[in-house]
């Protein structure tokens, strides 16, 4: 150590710290002061610092516990997503539980454990215990109400109510699944679906779930009165009971009627009944019913349906191989008077259940072609037949299709009501039917609502005439109907129509041959048939149509057509009254006697295109 008196101008290097006694004493005094400050019992902040030894603990166990809790939470989330919700209480249980809180704990069957704990099951406040005795007295009454509710579900199903069907949102899907499990065949494979409950059908397939064996005899008794054929089968398994009925009713019934019949007979709800018509054109469905009918466990009554026999029996299979013949279809349309393609197609398709040729027609892929050819051939035959007939023969043929019992006086009274001289009208009408030159057109004019169109239309309807309309005059084919009729009508002719007639149809009014342009054919020369015209214009009073005055015969209707208090016409201009009119004035109209014409060696024989079927022996 250097002396303290060393000169400060030189460098000074400190190698060791110098210790002095006075510094040590100062540190000791400071430590004593610090200890005395924090160790006094009077201090409120004693033991402020925790200087005890610290331990790390088991952090790995804590992490494992947290990870386990997270995994359990994820697993519960997946279970809630993929598993069904807990079963809900049924309507019967809810009704019973609502009677009393204590009644819920009393049941006949075994109860399922609840998911939650029941807390405070016994209240020792004294109030609940005082009410317990009164509620126990009403237990028998509540149980009796519970039994009544169960019995109201139906006698046929109360013994085997399935929880899965009662709780299923789609009852029909559940019934279809149970039907397939019980029978082994899908219900939709045996039936075809009717969306409307009002649609009627003769045959119905009925499947009733949950019917006991005692109710089967009721079905046999009730259905036997209303059915021509009945197939009853009771399918039993460990889980399901199905009653299957194939019923052929005497009259067509809708689904609503069938459901009402079954519910009233078996005392079951309509939710447990499936009713659809059978697939009568399915070979597989027909074979199923045929094979099941041979089982001793199946009750059958009545004759086998035709649709089933045609697809299962051998003789029907051989008969179904018949090919379609167009001549038979044309013969049928000709005999029934069908000339429109839509009518021919519709009514011949309906005939398929009875006629083999119609059945072959439905099985063909060229139905549209056959219908078109049939309509065309019938039109040709009808036109040729009409052309070969005289006016007397045509009227006689048309009147044969009308019933008897008319009164000719209605027509005569109507003509007198319109102030038309009856003798003059009969002369003009006779000349019109005979086609006398210059007398081939009959005009009826007058104010509106006098019955002009009604009078002419009724006559045209009974004679099967045709109408031409001036609205089609821009077409060159608007006169084509004149080539295929015996009498025609131009209704409500206006001034442009009379101008057209004055320019182009003078020779037609004369009754001379005219040339008519036909569609898809060359122009054809025909004799214009008798023509009736209704109009509000008096042609003979106008000089501009002076060349038509000698070619037409006019009658004026002056009075408005009368109606009774019910809105019905006062004069009945019907087909039967026109038939009576022609029969009464047949000779006055110079119509020939058809019986004399047949005796002259010209028998009226209907057209025969195919051999008639031999009549069955009596």
UniProtKB/Swiss-Prot annotation:
Domain (SF3 helicase) spans: 420-570
Which top EC class is named for this enzyme in its record? Answer: isomerase
Q: Motif (Nuclear export signal) spans which residues?
A: 99-108
In this chain, ATP is annotated as bound at 446-453
Q: Where is this motif: Nuclear localization signal?
A: 79-81
Tell me which UniProt keywords the record has, alphabetically: ATP-binding, DNA replication, DNA-binding, Early protein, Helicase, Host nucleus, Hydrolase, Isomerase, Isopeptide bond, Nucleotide-binding, Phosphoprotein, Ubl conjugation
Q: Which reaction does it catalyse?
A: Couples ATP hydrolysis with the unwinding of duplex DNA by translocating in the 3'-5' direction; ATP + H2O = ADP + phosphate + H(+)
Q: What is its EC number?
A: 5.6.2.4
Q: Where in the cell is it found?
A: Host nucleus
**Which GO cellular component terms are attached?**
host cell nucleus
Q: Give the matching Pfam families.
A: PPV_E1_C, PPV_E1_DBD, PPV_E1_N
Q: Where is this cross-link: Glycyl lysine isopeptide (Lys-Gly) (interchain with G-Cter in SUMO)?
A: 527
Q: How does it assemble?
A: Can form hexamers. Interacts with E2 protein; this interaction increases E1 DNA binding specificity. Interacts with host DNA polymerase subunit POLA2. Interacts with host single stranded DNA-binding protein RPA1. Interacts with host TOP1; this interaction stimulates the enzymatic activity of TOP1.
Family statement drawn from the similarity comment of this UniProt entry: Belongs to the papillomaviridae E1 protein family.
This molecule's function is given as: ATP-dependent DNA 3'-5' helicase required for initiation of viral DNA replication. It forms a complex with the viral E2 protein. The E1-E2 complex binds to the replication origin which contains binding sites for both proteins. During the initial step, a dimer of E1 interacts with a dimer of protein E2 leading to a complex that binds the viral origin of replication with high specificity. Then, a second dimer of E1 displaces the E2 dimer in an ATP-dependent manner to form the E1 tetramer.
Q: What is this protein called?
A: Replication protein E1
């Amino acid at each position: 150590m250097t002396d303290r008196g060393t000169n400060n101008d030189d460098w000074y290097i400190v190698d060791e710290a110098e210790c002095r006694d006075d510094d040590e004493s100062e540190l000791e005094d400071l430590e004593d002061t610090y200890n005395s400050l924090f160790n006094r019992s009077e201090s409120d902040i004693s033991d402020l610092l925790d200087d005890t030894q610290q331990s790390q603990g088991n952090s790995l166990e804590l992490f494992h516990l947290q990870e386990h809790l997270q995994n359990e939470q994820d697993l519960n989330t997946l279970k809630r997503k993929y598993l069904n919700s807990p079963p809900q209480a049924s309507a019967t249980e809810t009704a019973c539980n609502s009677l009393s809180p204590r009644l819920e704990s009393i049941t006949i069957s075994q109860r399922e454990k609840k998911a939650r704990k029941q807390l405070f099951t016994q209240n020792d406040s004294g109030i609940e215990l005082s009410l317990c005795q009164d509620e126990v007295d009403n237990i028998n009454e509540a149980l009796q109400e519970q039994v009544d509710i169960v019995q109201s579900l139906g006698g046929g199903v109360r013994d085997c109510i399935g929880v899965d069907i009662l709780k299923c949102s789609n009852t029909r899907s559940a019934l279809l699944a149970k039907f397939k499990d019980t029978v082994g065949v899908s219900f939709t494979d045996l039936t075809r679906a009717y969306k409307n409950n009002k649609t009627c059908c003769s045959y119905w397939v009925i499947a009733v779930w949950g019917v006991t064996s005692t109710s089967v005899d009721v079905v046999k008794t009730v259905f036997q009165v209303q059915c021509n054929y009945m197939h009853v089968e009771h399918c039993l398994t460990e889980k399901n009971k199905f009653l299957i009925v194939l019923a052929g009713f005497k009259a067509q019934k809708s689904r609503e009627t069938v459901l009402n019949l079954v519910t009233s007979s078996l005392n079951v709800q309509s939710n447990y009944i499936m009713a659809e018509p059978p697939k009568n054109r399915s070979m597989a469905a027909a074979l199923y019913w045929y094979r099941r009918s041979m089982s001793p466990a199946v009750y059958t009554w009545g004759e086998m349906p035709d649709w089933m026999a045609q697809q299962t029996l051998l003789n029907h299979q051989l008969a179904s191989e018949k090919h379609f013949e167009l001549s038979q279809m044309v013969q049928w349309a000709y005999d029934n008077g069908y000339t429109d393609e839509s009518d021919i197609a519709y009514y011949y398709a309906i005939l398929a259940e009875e006629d083999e040729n119609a059945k072959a027609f439905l099985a063909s892929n060229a139905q549209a072609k056959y219908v078109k050819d049939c309509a065309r051939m019938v039109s040709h035959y009808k036109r040729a037949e009409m052309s070969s007939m005289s006016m007397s023969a045509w009227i006689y043929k048309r009147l044969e299709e009308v019933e008897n019992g008319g009164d000719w006086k209605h027509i005569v009274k109507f003509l007198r009501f319109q102030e038309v001289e009856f003798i003059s009208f009969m002369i003009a009408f006779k000349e019109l039917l005979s086609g006398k030159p210059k007398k081939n057109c009959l005009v009826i004019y007058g104010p509106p609502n006098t019955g002009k169109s009604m009078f002419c239309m009724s006559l045209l309807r009974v004679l099967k005439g045709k109408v031409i309309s001036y609205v089609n005059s821009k077409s060159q084919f608007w006169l084509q109907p004149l080539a295929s009729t015996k009498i025609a009508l131009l209704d409500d002719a206006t001034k442009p129509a009379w101008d057209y007639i004055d320019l182009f149809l003078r020779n037609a009014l004369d009754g001379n041959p005219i040339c008519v342009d036909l569609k898809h054919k060359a122009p054809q020369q025909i004799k214009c048939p008798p023509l009736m015209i209704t109009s509000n214009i008096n042609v003979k009073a106008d000089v501009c149509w002076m060349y038509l005055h000698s070619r037409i015969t006019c009658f004026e209707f002056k009075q408005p057509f009368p109606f009774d208090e019910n809105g019905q016409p006062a004069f009945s201009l019907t087909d039967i009254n026109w038939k009576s009119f022609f029969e009464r004035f047949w000779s006055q109209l110079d119509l020939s006697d058809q019986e004399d014409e047949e005796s002259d060696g010209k028998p009226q024989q209907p057209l025969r295109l195919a051999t008639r079927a031999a009549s069955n022996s009596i």
